[in-house]
Regions:
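N-terminal low-complexity, intrinsically disordered segments
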Residues: 1-102
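Aromatic/basic-lined ligand-recognition segments
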Residues: 13-15, 83-95, 99, 110, ...
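Glycine-rich, often proline-containing surface loops adjacent to acidic residues and nearby aromatics
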Residues: 22-30, 98-115, 141-149, 213-226
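Conserved short hydrophobic interaction patches
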Residues: 49, 53, 124, 128-135, ...
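Short, highly charged C-terminal tails/helix-capping segments
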Residues: 75, 144-151, 256-266
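Hydrophobic alpha-helical segments and helix pairs
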Residues: 90-133
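Surface-exposed beta-loop interaction hotspot
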Residues: 119-154
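Long, compositionally biased interface segments
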Residues: 215-266
Length: 266
């Protein structure tokens, strides 16, 4: 069950920048309405218009998406869900650090580590959105999501998670055992706006650093908003992107401690 959370509204926690941000991937995704005004010809046009920035080899991605009705309809019918297959074409940049993915009713922009900052990622999002809009002319937006995946590497394998994270996993020392690994998922709903925050927190093993004496933690934050009855006008897209990004920043800062911040600024 999702938990309700309060936003700081006009009093954000304050924007922080780090010398070594732990961000491994940042994503912004749009889902449009209608979803059936896209075809292979449009994909070709899109590829041509973004090739200056994304010159890598395109690849196809197929995935299943759960479409749910969040509220009962006028007859009182309970919420239902359906599954549909989405086919996207992913187009990376030459160095593979940036990517855009496009398909029927869906567009996403991605950037990988090293993250160069919101000042670089935001124009990338806006540019891709403008190209999609010029080609498909969607009537509106039904979902926007901002997702940041962070890999936080502690300096020692026995480093105490409670020193670096504000809500560490329980240790259960009274059972005579130690914590080996964990996966925690929390879903939150904001009180002021119908915005959902999903936090995935886990201890992970980096394959390429198995011999390094350290501990790695995944902190995955996904902030999204959906419009079920009336689509968001296209001219309001970037203002909502900014708002979701602001809340993602606040959520990230709320998950970590000053000791983590020292790591990011080392």
């Amino acid at each position: 069950m999702a938990k309700a959370v309060k936003s700081n509204g006009s009093q954000p926690l304050g924007r922080r920048t780090y010398k070594n941000p732990p961000i491994t991937e940042a994503t912004c995704e749009f889902q449009f309405t209608p979803v059936d005004n896209w075809n292979l010809a449009y994909t070709g046009i899109f590829l041509e218009r973004v090739k200056a920035r994304y010159s890598g080899k395109p690849r196809e991605q197929r995935l299943l998406q759960l479409d749910s009705k969040q509220l009962p309809d006028a007859s009182g019918t309970l919420p239902s869900a359906s599954v549909r297959e989405i086919t996207k074409v992913q187009i990376p940049s030459a160095d593979g650090r940036e990517m855009v993915a496009v398909g029927p009713g869906i567009l996403s922009a991605h950037v990988l580590k090293p993250y160069s900052g919101w000042e670089t990622f935001r124009p990338q999002i806006e540019e891709a959105l403008a190209v999609y809009q010029a080609i498909a002319d969607p009537s509106g937006i039904r979902r926007i999501g901002i997702r940041y995946i962070n890999l936080i590497e502690l300096p020692a394998p026995n480093a105490e998670p409670s020193e670096y994270f504000s809500a560490p996993p329980t240790k259960n020392e009274e059972l005579g055992c130690r914590l080996d690994t964990f996966v925690i998922r929390h879903e939150y709903l904001y009180d002021d706006e119908p915005i959902r925050l999903v936090v995935n927190f886990a201890k992970v093993q980096k394959i390429e650093t198995v011999t390094v004496n350290g501990a790695s933690y995944l902190l995955d934050l996904d902030v999204s908003r959906e419009w079920q009855t009336e689509a968001l006008p296209m001219n309001r897209a970037m203002s909502l992107v900014e708002e979701l990004r602001r809340r993602e920043r606040e959520a990230f800062e709320a998950q970590i401690t000053p000791k983590s911040r020292e790591l990011f600024d080392a």
